[in-house]
């Protein structure tokens, strides 16, 4: 039943790839010693009675390696944007200058670097668990397909082995991304 093999496995490979991509996106929001516009991507602002991403109420730019500027489009939103940035767990202190907020990026202390490395480790572990859950779902579907006589027992075992290889590959990519991010965080 080679016709069912490819779509089934590619569906789970796609889900595992999305887990790795989600981790890299989460890592983008972790602060390192340098300014990055993606640092503020996870911040939501209370605007017009609802919570909106910062990028929908302001333009974020990086004019210098250790400075982020946020140009708020609506003057009435400046206080809300400042509050959202201060309340984020990024440890940033914006300076208001009219409709612009200047956010100096202070160098990270050794303690803060270690905390960020732990947070990165937690993010990576969450995605490892997600990949393992995807593997579990794939194996359950394969067992069900074998039970329903859609695939043979030999095909089920072969495909389970392939799912395990995909899982190992995804976890390896997660571990590599974590190692890279930890090195980036710990760099002075």
Swiss-Prot record:
GO terms for molecular function: ribosomal large subunit binding. Keywords: Cytoplasm, Protein biosynthesis. InterPro entries: Ribosome_recyc_fac, Ribosome_recyc_fac_dom, RRF_sf. It comes from the Bacteria. One of its GO terms (biological process) is cytoplasmic translational termination. GO terms for cellular component: cytosol. The keyword Protein biosynthesis applies. It holds the Pfam family RRF. The keyword Aminoacyl-tRNA synthetase does not apply. It is found in: Cytoplasm. Its main location: cytoplasm. Coiled coil: none annotated. HAMAP family: RRF. Responsible for the release of ribosomes from messenger RNA at the termination of protein biosynthesis. May increase the efficiency of translation by recycling ribosomes from one round of translation to another. Belongs to the RRF family. This is Ribosome-recycling factor. The lineage of its organism: Bacteria, Pseudomonadati, Pseudomonadota, Alphaproteobacteria, Caulobacterales.
């Amino acid at each position: 039943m080679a016709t069912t093999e490819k779509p089934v496995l590619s569906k789970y490979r796609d889900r595992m790839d999305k887990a790795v991509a989600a981790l890299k996106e989460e890592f983008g929001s972790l602060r390192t010693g340098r300014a990055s516009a993606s640092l503020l991507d996870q911040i939501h602002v209370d605007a017009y009675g609802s919570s909106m991403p910062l990028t929908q109420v302001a333009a974020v730019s990086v004019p210098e390696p250790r400075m982020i500027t946020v140009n708020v489009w609506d003057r009435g939103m400046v206080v809300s944007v400042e509050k959202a940035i201060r309340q984020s767990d990024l440890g940033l202190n914006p300076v208001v200058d009219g409709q612009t907020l200047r956010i100096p990026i202070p160098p990270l202390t050794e303690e803060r670097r270690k905390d960020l490395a732990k947070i990165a480790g937690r993010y990576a572990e969450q995605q490892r668990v997600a990949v393992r859950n995807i593997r579990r779902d794939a194996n359950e579907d394969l067992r069900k397909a074998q039970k329903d006589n859609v695939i043979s027992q030999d095909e089920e075992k072969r495909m389970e082995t392939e799912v395990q290889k995909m899982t190992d590959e995804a976890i390896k990519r997660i571990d590599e991304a974590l190692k890279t991010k930890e090195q980036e965080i710990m760099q002075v």
